[in-house]
């Protein structure tokens, strides 16, 4: 550690034990070095991944979670070339920037994806966050740890944006919204004349709907048990919104809605029976995208013969196969054109309501909570 570090004072929501509440505490954050940037957070989305890590997915404790931040650059390290103080940015996932996948424009498949985003990646030159007692707190969750008034990210995962949209609402573009829209556009390649069946009408599923409609998909069917979310899906452009519990034969209903079967389908639940329905409703030659987090021992709900005979591809998807530096500006352009109203998914919370926002996410009471500072 560099003993001559300068620090700023901030507030951050710290998780100290598995399953525990997040406590807003005073912290000190060392100034950025190298390719790092210090961000004053304007808003940060709450994602199911935050819940998963709170509840036991292995991350180093104590930790500051949060990985859908947006804000203003306050300081930069000496190696930063594309950002300066005053720039408005959306923060996304971390990547190494130099492996083959990163070099080829696929940072979501970075060979260091797990350690850089979940594994306690270290800051440059021993930089750190200290709690009120002077003890270190892990602070590079998804390269940002943005559940706080300030965060340190890297130049590679800070995307500069314009000043024409509410900065505090843009953070979810860096993960949840990017995951859904990118799954439809980048991974499945949805376009005019094609159809898509989306299983789950949460933030990721409805973002996939927005992405599919933005690029001209013909029919988009959302399968969701919550009546309010089905209604919202129809308002956002779904051709059909089906209640899986009310359909006697769900696969038949999807095939009827799509004129014989969906070109592609997308599962956001991670549940094997649901993925089985996605496979069954997809036309031969189509792709079943999978973004939902399954249980560790969840089986694939199809035999190899099923997949071979139907010629359906199972496609696991991380972060919408997106390069955030390119895809976040594309989503914003869709929004400016009136084709991507992602703000319809957002519910605002104050930062001191963080545990309420986490609860609302867990119970499905809010589609995309955003903590506003």
From Swiss-Prot:
Xref: SUPFAM superfamilies: GroES-like (SSF50129), NAD(P)-binding Rossmann-fold domains (SSF51735)
Organism: Castellaniella defragrans (strain DSM 12143 / CCUG 39792 / 65Phen)
Name of this chain's protein: Geraniol dehydrogenase
Pathway(s) per entry: Terpene metabolism; monoterpene degradation
Assigned keywords, A-Z: Metal-binding, NAD, Oxidoreductase, Zinc
Binding site for Zn(2+) 1: 47, 67, 175
Catalytic reactions of this protein: (2E)-geraniol + NAD(+) = (2E)-geranial + NADH + H(+); perillyl alcohol + NAD(+) = perillyl aldehyde + NADH + H(+)
Record GO terms (molecular function): alcohol dehydrogenase (NAD+) activity; NAD binding; perillyl-alcohol dehydrogenase (NAD+) activity; protein homodimerization activity; zinc ion binding
Cofactor dependency: Zn(2+)
UniProt-listed GO biological process terms: monoterpene catabolic process; monoterpenoid metabolic process
Record text on cofactor binding: Binds 2 Zn(2+) ions per subunit.
Domain of life: Bacteria
Job description of the protein: Involved in the degradation of the monoterpenes beta-myrcene and limonene. During anaerobic degradation of beta-myrcene, catalyzes the NAD(+)-dependent oxidation of geraniol to geranial. Can also catalyze the oxidation of (S)-perillyl alcohol to perillyl aldehyde, and to a lesser extent, the oxidation of nerol, citronellol, cumic alcohol, and benzyl alcohol. Cannot use NADP(+) instead of NAD(+) as cosubstrate.
pH dependence: Optimum pH is 9.4.
Annotated family: Belongs to the zinc-containing alcohol dehydrogenase family.
Description of how the protein assembles with itself and partners: Homodimer.
Regulation: Is inhibited by EDTA, N-ethylmaleimide, diethylpyrocarbonate, and 1-cyclohexyl-N-(2-morpholinoethyl)carbodiimide in vitro.
Record-linked InterPro entries: 4Fe4S_Fe-S-bd, ADH-like_C, ADH-like_N, ADH_Zn_CS, GroES-like_sf, NAD(P)-bd_dom_sf, PKS_ER
Enzyme class: oxidoreductase
Factors inducing expression: By the monoterpenes limonene and alpha-phellandrene.
Enzyme Commission number(s): 1.1.1.347, 1.1.1.144
Binding sites annotated in the UniProt record for Zn(2+) 2: 96, 99, 102, 110
